Amino acid sequence: MIRITFLAKQKVEEYSSRVTGFDILQPDISKEAIALRVNGELYDLSREIESDTEIDVIQLNDEEGLDIIRHDAAHIMAQAVKELFPNAQVTIGPTIQDGFYYDFAIDHTFTTDDLAAIEKKMKEIIKSNHRFIREVWARKQAINFFSSIGEKYKVDIISSIPESEDLTVYRQGDFVDLCRGPHSPSTSRVKAFKLMKVAGAYWRGNVKGPMLQRIYGTAWRNKDELNIYLKRLEEAKKRDHRRIAKDMDLFHIQEEAVGQVFWHEQGYTLYNVLESYIRKKLINNGYAEVKTPILVSKELWEKSGHWDKFRENMFIVDESESKKLAIKPMNCPCHVQIFNSYTRSYRNLPIRMAEFGMCHRNESSGSLHGLMRVRGFTQDDAHIFCMEEQVNSETVKFCALLKEVYSELGFNEISVKFSDRPNVRAGDNEVWDRAEKALLEAVKEAGLSYELNPGEGAFYGPKLEFILKDAIGRSWQCGTLQVDFILPERLGAFYIGADGQKYHPVMLHRAILGTFERFIGILIEHYAGKFPLWLAPTQLVILTVTNEADNYATEISNVLKEQGVRVKTDLTNEKVSYKIRLHSSNKVPILWIVGKNEVASKTVSVRNLGSEKQESSSCEKAVKLLLKKVLI
C-alpha cells in the first residue's frame, strides 16, 4: 500500500501498487499539469511513484513549470537540428533565465536562414505531439548507444557521472537524449518560442577545448507572453548602458585593458555621487570605513582557503621564487586582519567594517560585458563581526538599510532568495538551525517576500540574495548577506567573552550594490540615462543666447557651485537651438537659458528634460527651488 499526501489539498490517498501522476490526478488537472514535486524532487507525470510520499502538482503558471517547458524546447531544438544537419553532435542544453540554449559540434556555420529553418522544423515536431518518455539505462548500454550514433560528447558526459547515479535518457519520436529530466508529457505543451541568436562556446567552458556553436532560444507560456518579452528586449536595446554611455560620454573600455573601465569626467562624477551617497548611509548606520592593500601574499589566501578555490581567477604576481603575491579578488580576509590587530571584547561587538574595495578577478574574455561583467571592480563591501545572538538584529538593520537605499535609487520591487544548508557544510546542525532561523525572522520583519533556494548556502553558512526589478521588468541580483562561521576561525579571529574566555565571532559578509560598476550599468539602463536630479552627473547647464549674457551666466554658475550644485555653462557661439539639442541628448535634467532680456530682468528661462516648454522665473526663486530639488 502506498500513501500519497496531496499537499495543496492536505488530503491523503492510498493506492495498492505503484502509480504515476497520470493515475492519481483528475483528468481536468492532468491536462494543465506539467510535472509533480515528489518529496521535493521533480517527477515526470509518467514516472512511477514507488513509496509513501508528499506531492505538489507543478503547473504551467508555476516558475518550475515554465522552466520545464523551456527544457522541452531545448530538446525539441536539438531534434530539429539533428534532422536538418545529421552530422551535428549534440552536447549540452540547459535552461537559463528567460530561455534555453543547446551547444552543437558541427563544421557548418549556422546562419539566420538556418535558424528560420530550425524553427520551422521545431513547429513540426511540436505538432507531432511526441511523448517525452523517460528510460533508465545501464552505463554500458548508454555508452554503446551514443558511441554507435557518433555522439562522443554524450559519452564524455557519461564518463563524468558517478557510477552510483542512475543514467536516464529521454525519447521523443526517433530522437534520444541523455537527460536527468523532468519533461512535460509531450512536445505539444510548448506553445510559444523563438530562436534568438548563435554564439560560440567552448566545450565545458574550457578555452583549450573544442569550439562549439550555441543556439539561444526563448520559450513562454503563450504567444502574448512571448511578444511582451520580445518588446522588452527591444526596449532593453534602446537602454543598453554601453550605447547610452557613449552618448553621454560616461566611460569606455578598450583592448589594452580588457574588462577594466576608463571612467570619463561625467561617468566618474556619477560614480563619486553614488559612492558619497553610500558612504553617508554607512556612517549613519554605524559602519567604520577602512582601506586594505590590493596586493596580498599567497600565504593569507592559503590560510583563508581562497587560494584553492579562487586561484584560477586570481591575478598572480611573482615577487621572487619563494614568494607569490595575488591581487585581491575579495576583501574579507583583509578585514579579518584589521579585526585581529588588537584584542577585542564582547563589549566592542558588533563591529561593522566597510570598504570601497578595488578587486580584480581573471574572468574569461568571452564573459565580459560592458559594466555588467568586468575584471576590475569596486565592491561596496562590509563585514559585520558579531556574536551569534546578534545575527538576527544585525540582519534586520541591514535589510532596513538595503530597502532604504534601493527605494531612494528608484527600485521598489525587491525579493529575496534564502539559501539554506548544503549537504557538505561546516558546523553542527544546531548552529545552522539558529542561523537560518535568525535570517528568516529578519527577512519577515523587514516585510520582504522570499523564495527558498534549498541546499544552495555556502559550506560556511546560509545566505540571502536580494533581487531588484528594473523599469522594464528585469530582475537583477545585487545585494547579499552571508553568515560565516568558518573564516574567523581559520584566520584566528577571537574576542573575549563576558566569562573571560576566547570566542570566535560570527562574520556577516554583506553588500548592497554588489559592485559599483555593475550597479551603475543597471542604473543607466533603469533610467535610460535620465537620472533623477540628485544623481545626475551634471544637474544643470546654463546656456547663453548672446555673448552679452556670459557674465550673468557665469555669476549664477559660481553661486550654485558654492552650494554644491553640479552646474556647467555653455558660452559657445552656437545657436541656442543647437545647444538645447546637445544638452538634451546628454540627458541633462535642467537647462537655464539666458539672453539680454534675462540679464535685464534678473530672470532665467527654465527648461526641463523631456519638455519643450520654457518657463520664466526670477533667478532668486529658481536658485531656491533648484537647491531644494538637488538634495535627496
UniProtKB/Swiss-Prot annotation:
Endoplasmic reticulum among keywords: no
Keywords on record: Aminoacyl-tRNA synthetase, ATP-binding, Cytoplasm, Ligase, Metal-binding, Nucleotide-binding, Protein biosynthesis, RNA-binding, tRNA-binding, Zinc
Gene3D superfamilies hit by this protein: 3.10.20.30, 3.30.54.20, Anticodon-binding domain, Bira Bifunctional Protein, Domain 2, Threonyl-trna Synthetase, Chain A, domain 2
Region ranges (Catalytic): 240-532
SUPFAM superfamilies: Class II aaRS ABD-related (SSF52954), Class II aaRS and biotin synthetases (SSF55681), TGS-like (SSF81271), ThrRS/AlaRS common domain (SSF55186)
EC number: 6.1.1.3
GO cellular component: a single term: cytoplasm
GO biological process: threonyl-tRNA aminoacylation
Keyword Translocase included in the entry's annotation: no
Superkingdom as given in the UniProt entry: Bacteria
Residues annotated as domain TGS: 1-59
Cofactor info, note text: Binds 1 zinc ion per subunit.
Subcellular location(s) per record: Cytoplasm
Any one GO molecular function term: tRNA binding
Enzyme class: ligase
Reaction catalyzed: tRNA(Thr) + L-threonine + ATP = L-threonyl-tRNA(Thr) + AMP + diphosphate + H(+)
Binding site for Zn(2+): 332, 383, 509
Swiss-Prot/TrEMBL cofactor(s): Zn(2+)
Similarity field: Belongs to the class-II aminoacyl-tRNA synthetase family.
Assembly description: Homodimer.
HAMAP family reported for this sequence: Thr_tRNA_synth
Function description: Catalyzes the attachment of threonine to tRNA(Thr) in a two-step reaction: L-threonine is first activated by ATP to form Thr-AMP and then transferred to the acceptor end of tRNA(Thr). Also edits incorrectly charged L-seryl-tRNA(Thr).
PANTHER family, per the entry: THREONINE--TRNA LIGASE, CHLOROPLASTIC_MITOCHONDRIAL 2, THREONINE-TRNA LIGASE
Protein name: Threonine--tRNA ligase
